[in-house]
Design a protein with these regions (language model features):
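Start-transfer (signal-anchor) and selected internal transmembrane alpha helices
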Residues: 1-22, 88, 112-121, 261-297
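Transmembrane signal-anchor helices characteristic of membrane glycosylation enzymes that use polyprenol
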Residues: 6-33, 127-129, 187, 225-230, ...
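Transmembrane-helix motifs of polytopic, lipid-linked glycan transferases
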Residues: 13, 80-109, 152-159
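Aromatic- and kink-enriched transmembrane "portal" helix at the membrane-lumen/periplasm boundary
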Residues: 26-28, 71-79, 104-113, 120-147, ...
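Extracytoplasmic catalytic/substrate-binding loops of multi-pass membrane glycan-assembly enzymes
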Residues: 27-39, 49-61, 314-316
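Short hydrophobic/aromatic helix or loop-helix immediately within or flanking a transmembrane segment
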Residues: 43-73, 80-84, 91
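Membrane-interface transmembrane helices that cradle and orient dolichyl/undecaprenyl
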Residues: 101, 106-114, 153-173, 199-210, ...
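Short hydrophobic alpha-helices at membrane interfaces in multi-pass membrane enzymes
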Residues: 118-121, 156, 163-181, 210-222
Length: 316
């Protein structure tokens, strides 16, 4: 690892520490107005909040609540989830900025290291102290974790861009898809990264033309449609429909149809991954794997169904 890479990594973590310290010192001690009390209460006992449910936020919030020494401290520790997620977003903002700054400053500039790291520091600290971001960083709302996933996903796009010609670069695309799927369990804001992924893939792999850009934008629209119209509403519909058929028409036990639907999705995904790999269709193999990991990340919504069956006090 060269000196720039080492300093870049260290400075990123320094930005994380500064942001986390600021947010911890200014953290809400309990709960604030609007949805924060609902999210904190639901995360504490893994209950079900208003649709669509934010299950990943609630499950991670539950882990943070375990650090509370008393029930009075639960709100504080779930707020700490937002502080940690926001600090992570600041760290990735630093690395995203230095990635671009390194390519903008000439190599023969004697002050390149200072300029690049300085640009990243300014961007990271600006993000740290900007008003709306700071507010979401100190309360138990979903926007902090959503911002973290957005920054992480965009950083992963840049990592793929840098390694696109390497043998194992496609793993970054699969990782991006998984992060998008996980982010659905927090907020749909992360879907805004999908057009960026499609355009980055086009600009990195193909000659740039007007028609090519139009096709790349069309592909991003199809990817958004897949998530918003097939994955998001389609999987619950498939589970409910198959369960109704298995129970009402075939006389099977409750949830047998839902289990069959999950097995069907896994079997179809495994077959398509195996088929595209064996036939040498590399691009299609990556597409199938990415689609599967979006669905896999989205599976956090099973928590909403499972916990709702327990009839918790908060069950929206």
């Amino acid at each position: 690892m060269n000196s720039f890479a080492r300093l870049n990594r260290i400075m990123g973590w320094v930005m994380f520490a500064i942001a986390l310290a600021v947010y911890t010192l200014t953290l809400e001690q309990s709960v604030s107005l609007w949805d924060c009390g609902e999210f904190a209460s639901a995360a504490y006992r893994l209950q079900v909040v208003h649709p669509p449910g934010a299950p990943l936020f609630l499950m991670v919030g539950r882990l943070f609540s375990l650090m509370a020494s008393s029930p009075e401290m639960v709100g504080f520790w779930i707020n700490m989830l937002s502080a940690a997620a926001s600090a992570g977003c600041v760290m990735f903002t630093f690395w995203i900025t230095t990635y671009f700054a390194e390519r903008m400053v000439d190599d023969d500039n004697k002050n390149k290291l200072l300029l690049v790291l300085g640009a990243g520091t300014v961007a990271a600290l600006t993000n740290t102290f900007i008003d709306s971001f700071w507010f979401s960083a100190v309360e138990s709302e979903v926007y902090a974790m959503s911002s973290f996933f957005t920054a992480l996903t965009f950083w992963a796009v840049l990592r793929w861009w840098k390694a696109a010609d390497d043998a194992g670069a496609d793993r970054w695309l699969v990782f991006i898809a998984f992060m998008i799927g996980l982010a659905l369990g927090t907020h749909m804001l992360n879907l805004l990264v999908i057009p960026t992924v499609c355009l980055a893939y086009y600009f990195r792999k193909f000659p740039v033309t007007r028609n090519g850009i139009i096709l790349a934008l069309g592909a991003s629209g199809l990817a958004l449609g897949f998530v918003m119209k097939i994955v998001y509403p389609g999987i619950p519909w498939l589970l409910a429909t198959m369960d109704r058929i298995f129970v009402n028409d075939l006389g099977q036990s409750f949830y047998s149809g839902s289990i069959a639907a999950v097995v069907l999705i896994l079997a179809l995904s495994a077959y398509l991954m195996h088929y595209t790999y064996k036939t040498g269709r590399r691009n299609w193999n990556v597409i199938v794997m990415a689609a599967f990991f979006v669905v896999f990340g989205y599976s956090s919504y099973a928590m909403v169904i499972i916990r709702s069956m327990a009839n918790p006090a908060i069950d929206m």
